[in-house]
């Protein structure tokens, strides 16, 4: 048995190969789909657009009606398309979730609208940013089990998954996304966080620099 097979066989969560939903949450984009497929089915910006609307509450006595604040929300590409009349919110900053409420709403949108699946019948594998701490991992697992009530859930380091995708278990992974760049040494399928290096210069800074040169 190869090192990769041994590593995978020791994972605590066993999955039904045909029904695993894979979700990659990034600062710039969320990608989601099914394991075994070549490409994700969903690629949307990690954005929520909100616009505050006011409507009268007519449930009280005549003359006592009060305005209610109602938020119009849009997600992903639709949010970006309506950026002129919606306030944009970015739940993930520099690879770390900063707004768990909006992150949960965005995941609801991915499950219900984009993938059109019932989360409580789903088996989910989600990528984990190498910089996330234990509290972040626990919070995400709590949301998946208590809010979405998924059948099974696993969280795996993105650097380790990159190693597996290249058919090896040991090496140095360098990744640069929308909000953060990092290098992570991986040995026999385990990331070495004490040797990780990070830099908060990534795709967004490159984009901003190019725009400034136009």
Where do the model's predicted regions map?
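Gly/Thr-rich phosphate-binding beta-strand-loop-beta motif of the actin/hexokinase/Hsp70
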Residues: 8-47, 164-193, 210
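Secondary-structure junction/capping motif
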Residues: 3-9, 42-44, 76, 155-157, ...
């Amino acid at each position: 048995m190869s090192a990769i097979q041994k590593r995978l066989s020791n994972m605590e969560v066993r999955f039904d190969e045909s029904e695993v939903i894979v979700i990659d949450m990034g600062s710039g984009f969320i990608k989601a789909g099914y394991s075994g497929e070549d490409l994700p089915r969903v690629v949307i910006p990690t954005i929520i657009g909100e616009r505050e609307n006011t409507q009268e509450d007519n449930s009280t006595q005549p003359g006592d009606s009060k305005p209610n604040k109602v938020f119009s929300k849009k997600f992903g590409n639709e949010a970006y398309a309506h950026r002129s009349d919606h306030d944009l919110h970015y739940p993930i900053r520099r690879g770390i979730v900063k707004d768990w409420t909006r992150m949960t709403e965005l995941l609801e949108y991915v499950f219900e609208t984009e993938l059109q699946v019932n989360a409580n019948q789903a088996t989910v594998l989600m990528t984990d940013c190498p910089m996330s701490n234990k509290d972040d991992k626990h919070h995400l697992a709590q949301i998946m089990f208590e809010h979405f009530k998924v059948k099974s859930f696993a969280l795996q380091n993105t650097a380790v998954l990159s190693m597996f995708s290249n058919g090896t278990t040991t090496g140095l992974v360098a990744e640069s996304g929308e909000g953060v760049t990092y290098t992570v040494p991986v040995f026999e399928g385990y990331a070495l966080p004490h040797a990780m290096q990070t830099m908060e210069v990534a795709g967004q800074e490159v984009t901003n620099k190019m725009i400034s040169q136009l």
